[in-house]
């Protein structure tokens, strides 16, 4: 029997880029001529991290907890949803080890905003900045990301619990 219950979760989200919406990634408003379409603020990065948290803790997915059919989540701040997801994961007995995320977007350039995204993740998850990582990639002008039709985010998280005896069956 392992002395620790270690869990890894993977999250994914994609949203279309459309005119008339703000572009918000990692809780940062990024200047761009289009934004992401969605029921909430459509922050694909935070949605991927939220999904990874729920998955690692075997708590389902973001749609189960914050359904896009529920009017209370219309226009929701994804940072608030992420904080609530972290609370539920901790309530289930887990601590957040680290987060590694990738945003795939041909444009705009995200590198100038990575530091603010990492700071928001660390604050919302109540973990050190050194345990959060965000990478920005292009899709080399291939696929819908390369044509600037949408943005994809992927995330991996590690959770741990000090005793497997506490694990839910």
Curated annotation (Swiss-Prot):
Q: What is this protein called?
A: 2-C-methyl-D-erythritol 2,4-cyclodiphosphate synthase
* Cofactor annotation comment: Binds 1 divalent metal cation per subunit.
Molecular function per GO: 2-C-methyl-D-erythritol 2,4-cyclodiphosphate synthase activity; metal ion binding
- Which pathway? Isoprenoid biosynthesis; isopentenyl diphosphate biosynthesis via DXP pathway; isopentenyl diphosphate from 1-deoxy-D-xylulose 5-phosphate: step 4/6
**What's the source species for this entry?**
Cupriavidus taiwanensis (strain DSM 17343 / BCRC 17206 / CCUG 44338 / CIP 107171 / LMG 19424 / R1)
Name any one Pfam family assigned in the record: YgbB
Which Gene3D superfamilies does its entry note?
2-C-methyl-D-erythritol 2,4-cyclodiphosphate synthase
Q: What is its EC number?
A: 4.6.1.12
Q: What are the entry keywords?
A: Isoprene biosynthesis, Lyase, Metal-binding
The family assignment reads: Belongs to the IspF family.
Does the UniProt entry include the keyword Mitochondrion? no
Q: Where is this site: Transition state stabilizer?
A: 39, 138
Which GO terms fall under biological process for this protein?
isopentenyl diphosphate biosynthetic process, methylerythritol 4-phosphate pathway; terpenoid biosynthetic process
Under catalytic activity, the entry for this protein gives:
4-CDP-2-C-methyl-D-erythritol 2-phosphate = 2-C-methyl-D-erythritol 2,4-cyclic diphosphate + CMP
* Cofactor entry: a divalent metal cation
Primary role: Involved in the biosynthesis of isopentenyl diphosphate (IPP) and dimethylallyl diphosphate (DMAPP), two major building blocks of isoprenoid compounds. Catalyzes the conversion of 4-diphosphocytidyl-2-C-methyl-D-erythritol 2-phosphate (CDP-ME2P) to 2-C-methyl-D-erythritol 2,4-cyclodiphosphate (ME-CPP) with a corresponding release of cytidine 5-monophosphate (CMP).
InterPro entries, A to Z = MECDP_synthase (IPR003526), MECDP_synthase_CS (IPR020555), MECDP_synthase_sf (IPR036571)
The protein's assembly and partners:
Homotrimer.
The positions annotated for binding a divalent metal cation are 13, 15, 47
Q: Which residues bind 4-CDP-2-C-methyl-D-erythritol 2-phosphate?
A: 13-15, 39-40, 61-63, 66-70, 144, 147
Q: What class of enzyme is it?
A: lyase
Q: Does the keyword Phosphoprotein apply?
A: no
